[in-house]
């Protein structure tokens, strides 16, 4: 392996930190194409200790596996485990169900049972971190204060990778604050030939991105061929009104009808509920048609890693109404279109990006959206 002087210095600093262990984590920052992942892989292969790679979402973990990483997990799966259920409450509802004669009440009881039976979470006693010599954590900006503290509680040294060119995390302040311990700024010569890295570099530097073809990626005008959107794994947008319109249109293209989710639909979580394993920005699939109750929806869900859960969710997002920020119900919406802010920490093979954000952090917004694509990108602009 041939290293640039900057990469060689980064490797030296990582090894020095690991040997001295004067602090529990080391942050390695770098723009897209500067070799963060290459350095991390080399460290994992040559340190001679068991190493676990971790990503914030299942989609990002999948991309790491595609790149040849063998031992990879999501953060939540690695450190949290389902814990005991509300047994007494479940037994009381089951007893009521046996004698209940009113169909509406039976439906309510069944969804209360689903909700109580869903897993709640605690730190894993059998976490893979327990026997681990090193954790390599991708996208460290997405780690909240609580998750960061939980990670450190296992006592395993953490090499945290991140990209300061991206948007700040959507939830506020990350656990990993301040400048990275080492920052890579030199985009590798071979990476410059990658169309997505090239487009990302133009965006980060605030340069114009002309219309045209970039390998298998492209920049097109809005209002043309809609196949680019239909073929994408994920549509990313800048505005909530575009997200609403995109979700409506894509549901219609697929063949779903009605306001509320049918079986097999794609949802995104809009509010953290760590106690039961729901995290803001996490995507889920519906296993059954939603059940409409008096003041909420009953949802049967499965996440990217096959974990099943029941939810009692507020109806407002599915009806285009303002969210109730203070409700005890969980909050989901359709996930066919996501804002770039909500997409942070994840990645898809094929992305369609509606370039429409001209608010704060314009260059970071575009850079973040572009780097959500692993293989193929279509940027759709208004003019």
Spans of model-derived segments:
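Dynamic helix-loop-helix/coil hinge segments at AAA+ ATPase domain boundaries and subdomain interfaces
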Residues: 1-9
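Conserved helicase motor core of P-loop NTPases
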Residues: 8-36, 113, 146-156, 161-310, ...
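Conserved P-loop NTPase motor core of helicases/translocases
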Residues: 8-19, 29-31, 52-147, 186-187, ...
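Hydrophobic positions on the alpha1 helix immediately C-terminal to the Walker A/P-loop
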Residues: 39, 43
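Structural recognition of the conserved hydrophobic beta-strand(s) that form the central parallel beta-sheet
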Residues: 53, 136, 157-163, 379
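A short helix->loop->beta-strand "cap" motif at the edges of active sites that frequently abuts
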Residues: 132-133, 154-158, 373-375
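Conserved Walker B
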Residues: 137-143, 164-165, 343, 356-358
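C-terminal accessory regions
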Residues: 301-383
């Amino acid at each position: 392996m041939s290293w640039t002087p900057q990469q060689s210095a980064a490797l030296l600093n990582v090894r020095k930190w690991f040997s001295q262990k004067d602090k529990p984590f080391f942050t390695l920052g770098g723009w897209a194409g500067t070799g963060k992942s290459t350095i991390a892989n080399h460290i994992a292969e040559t340190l001679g200790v068991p190493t676990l790679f971790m990503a914030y979402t299942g989609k990002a973990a999948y991309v790491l596996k595609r790149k040849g990483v063998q031992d990879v997990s999501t953060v939540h799966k690695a450190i949290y485990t389902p814990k005991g259920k509300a047994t007494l409450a479940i037994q009381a509802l089951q007893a009521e169900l046996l004698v209940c004669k009113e169909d509406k009440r039976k439906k309510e009881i069944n969804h209360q049972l689903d909700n109580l039976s869903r897993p709640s979470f605690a730190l894993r006693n059998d976490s893979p971190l327990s026997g681990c010599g090193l954790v390599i954590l991708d996208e460290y900006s997405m780690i909240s204060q609580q998750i960061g503290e939980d990670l450190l509680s296992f006592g395993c040294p953490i090499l945290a990778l991140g990209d300061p060119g991206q948007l700040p995390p959507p939830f506020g302040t990350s656990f990993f604050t301040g400048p990275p311990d080492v920052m890579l700024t030199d985009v590798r010569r071979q990476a410059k030939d990658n169309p997505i890295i090239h487009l990302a570099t133009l965006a980060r530097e605030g340069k114009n991105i002309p219309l045209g073809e970039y390998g298998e990626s492209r920049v097109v005008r809005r209002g043309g061929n809609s196949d680019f959107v239909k073929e994408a794994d994920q549509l990313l947008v800048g505005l909530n009104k575009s997200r609403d319109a995109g979700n409506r249109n894509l549901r219609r293209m697929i063949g779903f009808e009605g306001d509320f989710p049918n079986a097999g639909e794609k949802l995104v979580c809009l509010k953290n509920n760590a106690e039961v394993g729901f995290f803001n920005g996490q995507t889920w699939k519906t296993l059954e048609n939603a059940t409409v109750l008096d003041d909420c929806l009953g949802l049967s869900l499965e996440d990217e890693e096959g974990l099943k859960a029941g939810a009692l969710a507020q109806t407002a997002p599915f009806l285009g109404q303002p969210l109730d920020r203070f409700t005890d119900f969980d909050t989901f919406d359709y996930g066919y279109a996501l804002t770039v802010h909500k997409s942070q920490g994840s990645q898809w093979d094929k992305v369609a990006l509606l370039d429409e954000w001209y608010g704060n952090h314009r260059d970071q917004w575009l850079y973040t959206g572009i780097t959500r694509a692993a293989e193929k990108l279509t940027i759709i602009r208004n003019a």
